[in-house]
């Protein structure tokens, strides 16, 4: 049995079993060598127990698979959390800006790692994040927000990349139209300022939207001027109503499907002949779409007949003075503002705006109106002045409101009326009226209402250190010194006794020699009763004194019980005209209507109004 090799052929298999292809053998004759080395058939010799056998390919395969899986995970982390430094070194500022989401650089995607970087992955990620600048990523805008697709979208993105998009647009206008934008338009600082005419430069508008806008803008504008040149479009729009830059921008954004970044909106130069000629000549070009009648500022500067009339037009200061006198304006700011608003309808106002000496003419106009008004006032008696003033009061009131208020203060109305009659006539030692009493009893309200209807002047003791503080009394028919205190009474007792007597006094006025005048009727209100102090005894005969004892009453809704208005004083003077011994207006020919109004211009009396 030991000499026989193999197995018994009687049991199923009588031949040697030979496998033609070995599964895990690298040698061709492994089987022969196995049998040749062991002449004995001992099955235990098939295994070598003398030394350890090394692990086969399974461990190496597992290690390779784990290595590849780890490398893939590391590469995914690198692509997710940081970008390559090489791109940042080229332009760190460009790398920190991104208009739309973009893919990270993949240059390290297939690099093999040595193993050292894998072992220090956490430290490397920390260093890379600290060294990588923050990126500013702007989400990609939708096509509707970009104001067009394709080429228009690219133009919009080009503007977004510019540091100064406005300078970019201005350069494009100069490049495509051959003229600077601000040679045709003037600049408004505020977006709220309104104007009827606007010059608009639009960048990157789709051509089909420009064509549709020609019809849509006709609903809003009286004149439309459109010139398309490449990616730029120039508009001159004369709207039916004045609009602000914000309103114009929103309108064009909805019609042209653009962003505000793509528009420049400014009002045109209305007094530039060169600018007017550009719009006029451009409307004759076949590439320009123009619809509607020319605006007036273009016609006046381009048409021959209008130009000749404009050249012949000269500014007449007397017309401006007459207008200010008729409007009863003496303040320079009011005259300047209101007269400038008339430039659209008045040729003289338009000529004044075009003049280089506007300020000088304005100052002279206001000064002349004050001279005329002062001369007119001095020429009138007190009766004429009162009648002149109440004729300018509109509406009707009731004189009993004033009578009720005087009786409410426990004052005999007959005594008050007699003192008031002598007061307005300016009789010597009777031309000063004092109303004193506790606070909130209506002293100032009563005095101010009378001063307003008679257009008097107020003097304030706060200016007493100036020698000019009495000068307003030379320009009025009635004066008021409100809330006189003890220092004020000391000043009056020391320096103004002769003025209260009705004598001529010298009053110093600024930029003039001292004037010789008589004080007009002077009304004084005070919380101080001079009769309570004997040191003012010399003023007793010069001042008529009345006391208001009760606080002024108000209704539950806060309105005053007694209506001391211009209409009430108008009714008071008309009702008590005879009792106040005022002269009849008919005797002075003041209300007959045949007397011609004051005229300070050289125009023909029978000329057109």
From Swiss-Prot:
Binding site for ATP: 437-444
Modified residues (Phosphoserine): 83, 91
Chain segments carrying region Disordered: 37-67
Root EC class: isomerase
Motif (Nuclear localization signal): 78-80
GO BP annotation list: DNA replication
One example GO MF annotation: DNA helicase activity
Purpose: ATP-dependent DNA 3'-5' helicase required for initiation of viral DNA replication. It forms a complex with the viral E2 protein. The E1-E2 complex binds to the replication origin which contains binding sites for both proteins. During the initial step, a dimer of E1 interacts with a dimer of protein E2 leading to a complex that binds the viral origin of replication with high specificity. Then, a second dimer of E1 displaces the E2 dimer in an ATP-dependent manner to form the E1 tetramer.
Subunit structure of this chain's protein: Can form hexamers. Interacts with E2 protein; this interaction increases E1 DNA binding specificity. Interacts with host DNA polymerase subunit POLA2. Interacts with host single stranded DNA-binding protein RPA1. Interacts with host TOP1; this interaction stimulates the enzymatic activity of TOP1.
Stated name of the protein: Replication protein E1
Species of provenance: Human papillomavirus type 49
